[in-house]
């Protein structure tokens, strides 16, 4: 080997080594050089997996546990050609980045959104406050908001006799990362659960893996099929706001427990400290005059028994006024929010108790959520108990129970609108209904056919219900139910023809076009000679005003009677129901003017 060959081999090996250091997802990227320069400057690693490119996680020199919940923000409306080399300098200006996950597409471009996790919660809040609507490109603004790191699963189909310890042990056998199990006791029988539980996991990834493993049809618990879905995430309230709360949320009460009993129990430490108590089924809100009294009562009564039931007492979580107004505006379909009708914040309740007892859901939850929240103003996939969404503030007592319109907004929204009136088929006819749809008499009249054509007199509709019944029997049921005598069919046909000839005059010369009456219409079979007639009506023509005889003959399939009615003309095809007029395709029509 010559010196030149050795130098070439060394250069090729060094080039191969340098290319091997480029991580997957960065090699071949449109801005590969810029990404490599970013990694060299910050010392963060970068790798692509599961359709996302991770920058950091953890950062270099990190020691300690994973950042707590609330440290991650969601970044949306990212231009498709913007990558980490432009995003990192913007977001690291407000705090130290623990991890940045940019969602990638197959073509190498981003999918328009990313997740940025900071080392501390206050840094994430600062990012939302300062970087929302940040102009990353001319005319392109970023959307930054707090990310919901949901670590809780809803599991239904649990036997009601199982205890919390049994459920925790069984779930821990089939999934990993289980931290806690929340089980709600039945209000009627405290020895039973409500058939569902909430499982808390150590991370969102662990919860997602458990959800995939527990999907229906894969695993059975205690020999039962289970239902698994994401639980409604807990409301993350600012710590400064929680420091001002002086309302306690008390759950696991007995149904028989009264508000006076609760007020007496919570006011025993300082007489007169309880302003009011509102109880709904097995939970209640206790309002105090001061926060100190509320905290003191919570510390002393949490876990104690009241009338044989173990109480769970916590501070009520408020919803800020701005969010409440935004929800109200969305529920009204984008209308302007009314000025300060509500207090500074409304207090949420136990959504699972509300869902269990089937209270009417307010405008932001329940089966009519899509009707009240117009244009998709509020979105989300989280679920609460039994697949129901957690209650929001609209139409509820402090976010707790229905306080007015609620699900009945359809009725209120329908007021004041002009309703279409029905046709007055039978005036003053009262019809007993078996459904909520009522038939209302209106003022719109249907013109009678006899007013235009005198040869077809329209029978007036009877106004009494008994006469209506008789009219129905005579003109609808009789032609089908009566069995005619074949021997008298010819006589009946002759009588009908005579009556028709007596009622309808024969006209030799038609009147002018404007006064021309309706001419008879004959349906003629193909290849059959037409009927010659001298007048406007044939001798055997049977008007629609008296169709009973022809109908009976047709329904009974009596060819002789049918031929007798229509003058023995075999080519005539009678209608089975002449009252419906001629609506079928007619091969040939013969009209005489």
UniProtKB/Swiss-Prot annotation:
Keywords: Cytoplasm, Methylation, mRNA processing, mRNA splicing, Nucleus, Repeat, RNA-binding
Region: Disordered, residue numbers: 1-24
GO biological-process terms attached to the record: mRNA processing; RNA splicing
Extent of Low complexity compositional bias: 1-20
Modified-residue entries (Asymmetric dimethylarginine), positions: 394, 405
Pfam family, one: RRM_1
GO MF assignments: RNA binding
Assembly notes: Homodimer. Interacts with A1CF. Interacts with APOBEC1; form an mRNA editing complex. Interacts with RBPMS.
Function: Single-stranded RNA-binding protein that functions in a variety of RNA processes, including alternative splicing, RNA stabilization, and RNA editing. Functions as an enzyme-substrate adapter for the cytidine deaminase APOBEC1. With APOBEC1 forms an mRNA editing complex involved into cytidine to uridine editing of a variety of mRNA molecules. Through the binding of their 3'UTR, also stabilizes a variety of mRNAs and regulates the expression of genes such as the interferon alpha/beta receptor and interleukin-10. Also involved in the alternative splicing of several genes including TJP1.
Stated family: Belongs to the RRM RBM47 family.
Name of the protein described by the UniProt record: RNA-binding protein 47
């Amino acid at each position: 080997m010559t010196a030149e060959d050795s130098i070439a081999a060394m250069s090729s090996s060094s080039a191969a080594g340098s290319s091997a250091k480029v991580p997957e997802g960065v090699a071949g990227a449109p801005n590969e050089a810029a990404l490599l320069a970013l990694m060299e400057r910050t010392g963060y690693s970068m790798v692509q997996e599961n359709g996302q490119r991770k920058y950091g996680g953890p950062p270099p020199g990190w020691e300690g546990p994973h950042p707590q919940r609330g440290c991650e923000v969601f970044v949306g409306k990212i231009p498709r050609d913007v990558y980490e080399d432009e995003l990192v300098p913007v977001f690291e200006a407000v705090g130290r980045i623990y991890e940045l996950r940019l969602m990638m597409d197959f073509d190498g471009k981003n999918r328009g959104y990313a997740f940025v996790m900071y080392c501390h919660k206050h840094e994430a809040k600062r990012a939302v406050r300062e970087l929302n609507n940040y102009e990353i490109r001319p005319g392109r603004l970023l959307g930054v908001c707090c990310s919901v790191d949901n670590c809780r699963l809803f599991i239904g189909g649990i036997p009601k006799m199982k205890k919390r310890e049994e459920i925790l042990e069984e779930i821990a056998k089939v999934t990993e990362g289980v931290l806690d199990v929340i089980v709600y006791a039945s209000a009627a029988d405290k020895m039973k659960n409500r058939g569902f539980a909430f499982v808390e996991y150590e991370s969102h990834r662990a919860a997602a893996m458990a959800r995939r493993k527990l999907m229906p049809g894969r695993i059975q618990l205690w020999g039962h099929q289970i239902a698994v879905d994401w639980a409604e995430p807990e409301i993350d309230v600012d710590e400064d706001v929680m420091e001002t709360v002086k309302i306690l949320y008390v759950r696991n009460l007995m149904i028989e427990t009264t508000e006076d009993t609760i007020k007496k129990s919570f006011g025993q430490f300082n007489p007169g400290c309880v302003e009011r108590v509102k109880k709904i089924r097995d939970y209640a809100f206790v309002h105090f005059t001061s926060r100190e009294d509320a905290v003191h009562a919570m510390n002393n009564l949490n876990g104690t028994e009241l009338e044989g039931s173990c109480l769970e007492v916590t501070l009520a979580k408020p919803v800020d006024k701005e969010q409440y107004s935004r929800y109200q505006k969305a529920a009204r379909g984008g209308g302007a929010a009314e000025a300060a009708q509500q207090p500074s914040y409304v207090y949420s309740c136990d959504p699972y108790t509300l869902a269990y007892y089937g209270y009417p859901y307010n405008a932001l939850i329940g089966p009519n959520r899509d009707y009240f929240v117009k244009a998709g103003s509020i979105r989300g996939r989280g679920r609460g108990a039994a697949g129901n969404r957690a209650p929001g503030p609209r139409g509820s007592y402090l976010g707790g129970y229905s306080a007015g319109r609620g699900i009945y907004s359809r009725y209120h929204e329908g007021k004041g609108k002009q309703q279409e009136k029905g046709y007055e088929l039978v005036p003053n006819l009262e019809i007993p209904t078996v459904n909520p749809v009522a038939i209302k008499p209106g003022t719109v009249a249907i013109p009678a056919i006899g007013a235009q054509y005198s040869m077809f007199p329209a029978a007036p509709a009877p106004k009494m219900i008994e006469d209506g019944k008789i009219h129905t029997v005579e003109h609808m049921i009789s032609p089908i139910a009566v069995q005619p005598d074949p021997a008298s069919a010819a006589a009946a046909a002759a009588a009908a023809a005579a009556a028709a000839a007596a009622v309808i005059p024969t006209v030799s010369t038609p009147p002018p076009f404007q006064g021309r009456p309706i001419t008879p219409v004959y349906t003629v079979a193909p290849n059959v000679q037409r009927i010659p007639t001298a007048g406007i009506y044939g001798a055997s023509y049977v008007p629609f005003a008296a169709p009973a005889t022809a109908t009976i003959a047709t329904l009974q399939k009596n060819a002789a009677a049918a031929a007798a009615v229509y003058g023995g003309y075999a080519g005539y095809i009678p209608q089975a129901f002449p009252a419906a007029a001629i609506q079928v395709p007619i091969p040939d029509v013969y009209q005489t003017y």
